């Protein structure tokens, strides 16, 4: 029995030594490029300083039992921790224009089956915060932008973002999950990049919140405090409906029908952008903008750009005594007012 006990003790010691070796790149008290990292009560804390820092977290190549922290985001590990010892991750950057991202190129490790909640926070400055981008596994992260004009890219999974002060942007790309966006202060934008296939998108008011729903993928974006919605529909015969958004914070919706992101050419497919008015008395102006039309006079202005002349813009006034004026739309887009071509 003595021998058995002795062997067990040696095994425990070996595990402890291995854990120490894993964390050997830099001690918890060390600062690398202004960044500290340490585990406390099961939470991996990564903290930036007041300068502009870049941080990436990833799994070790060839050994997914190790989480690495890359201060400088230059591809080298400055801190390493046993994955099994990490039950939550909190990244907090300081002042300055910082970048913090989850690099899941070696595997997913945030919001996975181990329930490892992850929060990525900026500070003052114009920060870039990015969740896992490549893995199919759900990676549900929470983002806190702080002050400054921040860019948050949630990536895969169902994410929650608190954008904070400043004029911030939340980015969504095809294949990602359903996200919750709290715009908070400033003029904030949701940038939604679709796919080069036929898509059906509907924007509706849910009390004071915007519900942005895409049928393909069953994607729901739930937003509050977001003033601008940029929808890049891309290729395919798309259908986008903008309902009455009275009560929400959305004042501008931009529908880009170009065939490619940043492109200037229309996609050649017949797209439909439907704008629904209110049951009150509406005064609506529909004006050509050189590549489509702008619809103003409702709670939310709608701008359709890079349209084909065969694309269709139905404007439905609904109930009430309404007035609609059109100008400069000939050859830009097919405008229908209450079903009548104008």
Name every feature range the model reports, one short phrase each.
Residues 14-21:
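Bacterial N-terminal signal peptides
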Residues 27-342:
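Acidic, glycine-rich low-complexity segments
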Residues 1-2, 28:
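Initiator methionine at the very start of the polypeptide chain
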Residues 3-13:
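Bacterial N-terminal signal peptides that target proteins for export
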């Amino acid at each position: 029995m003595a021998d058995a006990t002795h062997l067990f003790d040696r095994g425990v010691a070996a595990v402890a030594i291995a854990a120490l070796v894993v964390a050997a790149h830099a001690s918890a008290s060390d600062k690398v490029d202004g960044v500290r990292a340490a585990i406390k009560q099961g939470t991996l804390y990564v903290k930036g300083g007041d300068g502009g820092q870049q941080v990436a977290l990833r799994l070790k190549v060839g050994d997914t039992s190790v989480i690495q922290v890359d201060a400088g985001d230059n591809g080298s590990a400055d801190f390493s921790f046993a994955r099994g010892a990490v039950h939550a991750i909190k990244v907090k950057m300081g002042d300055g224009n910082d970048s913090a991202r989850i690099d899941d190129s070696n595997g997913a490790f945030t919001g996975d089956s181990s329930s490892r909640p992850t929060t990525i926070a900026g500070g003052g400055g114009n920060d870039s915060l990015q969740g896992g981008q490549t893995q199919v596994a759900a990676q549900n992260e929470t983002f806190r932008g702080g002050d400054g004009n921040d860019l948050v890219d949630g990536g895969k999974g169902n994410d929650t973002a608190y954008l904070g002060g400043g004029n911030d942007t939340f980015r969504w790309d095809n294949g990602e999950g359903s996200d919750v966006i709290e715009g908070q202060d400033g003029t904030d934008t949701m940038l939604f990049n679709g796919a080069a296939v036929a898509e059906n998108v509907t924007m509706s008011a849910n009390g004071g919140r915007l519900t942005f729903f895409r049928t393909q993928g069953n994607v729901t974006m739930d937003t509050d405090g977001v003033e601008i919605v940029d929808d890049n529909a891309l290729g395919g015969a798309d259908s986008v409906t903008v309902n009455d958004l009275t009560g929400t914070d959305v004042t501008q919706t931009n529908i880009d029908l170009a065939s490619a992101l940043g492109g200037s050419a229309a996609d050649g497919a017949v797209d439909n952008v439907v704008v629904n008015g209110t049951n009150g008395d509406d005064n609506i102006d529909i004006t050509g903008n050189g590549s489509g039309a702008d619809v103003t006079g409702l709670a939310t202005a709608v701008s359709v750009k890079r349209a084909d002349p065969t694309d269709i813009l139905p404007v439905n006034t609904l109930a009430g005594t309404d007035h609609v004026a059109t100008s400069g739309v000939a050859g830009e887009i097919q405008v229908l007012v209450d079903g009548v071509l104008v």
